[in-house]
């Protein structure tokens, strides 16, 4: 029995246009090989019949991309701004003739183990339930009210409760058993003028279908907003490159010594009843300690100094030189000074935060290291915490840092300082430290960078390809989420 996949592509992608994207949203690349539509098509058997709905004024270059899909048909409709359901309604006469119809948004990505479409006996709304970084503070999705997988009602752009991460969230994939019933339900939405933000949505059609059930996917991501799209791309790239990078960095001469300050109190973790030091939290798919994951992204010829507070870590002795402090310090930079007496003054040092790591160009690092007194790691800050007030931001030109803004909102044309630093020698570190010590109650290495700029040291920045921050409970959850997402089969 034939099955169909309908994908409406008649939108304008205004959020992307407003952010300066030049490619129409469904055709944006999510990785080297696939655009948004490719990733959806590949979830289904090759012989499924594909129906694309496009505007009559769609550019020819996009039509050519659609025409490459085997066993497909394109329907042209008049331009409108009334949402995906209205697009579907404009080809309703064709849909009445067919059955077993999958309907998919163009801007979703999902995975489900053993996804089968051979024998589907009911109308389904495909849903995700659980913690998700994009829904932690946002319920602007469609949600289903269910009992034993039967759907009783669907809301669009709002949840039924305040605990929406425990509700079935419609991912934007639907299955209609019968074309006529599908069209009848669509007509009822439009005839009753059931618009949300002046648009008609397919989810609401299921309120007019008698028998409907929920079917859960394992993982899901909405990539229809520029920030979500960029975050998804970052983690997708991370998953594809991390194994290669970890192998390559093992032989990099990153510095003579590596220092990892880990003597903070971890207040944000304590506030959420996480009572072990954050760098010992189990993270990722393999449940390794955070500090062990960071070690994998550093050269293996070095045994980093790991500076802790009141914590004996004998089981880490094989990888780290653990230095256990008896009392709290005045901050990250102050912590680093506690091991500098063990390092000759002409030796270079690399400082890596205990909760972050980067994937970066090793060749660019080597080039910048040669001409730098201090080399600062920076990021485009593709994170869900992009608007934090606690970040430090740098302004640079041709990699040379011109200014630094500490613990403030993001400034225009700035990059996020990540927490990893190279110092040509400990004398440079100490000169900057002494200046900062006189001025600050909490001495961050960020403060040392600020003093270095004033003293005309050669301070450069390297923009990483991927910046991974696990420094708050939420960011740690995000890391775990994406690690599992891209390892799902």
Q: Which residues fall in each region the model found?
A:
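N-terminal glycine-rich phosphate-binding loop and ensuing alpha1 helix
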Residues: 1-60, 246-312
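Conserved alpha/beta core of the MobA/IspD/sugar-nucleotide pyrophosphorylase nucleotidyltransferase superfamily
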Residues: 3-5, 14, 167-258, 267, ...
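Alpha-helical elements of Rossmann-like donor-binding domains used by nucleotide-donor carbohydrate transfer enzymes
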Residues: 39, 89-90, 231, 293, ...
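Conserved beta-loop-beta/alpha segment of the NTase-like Rossmann-fold superfamily
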Residues: 59-146, 312-392, 431
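Conserved core of the sugar-phosphate nucleotidyltransferase
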Residues: 111-193, 359-440
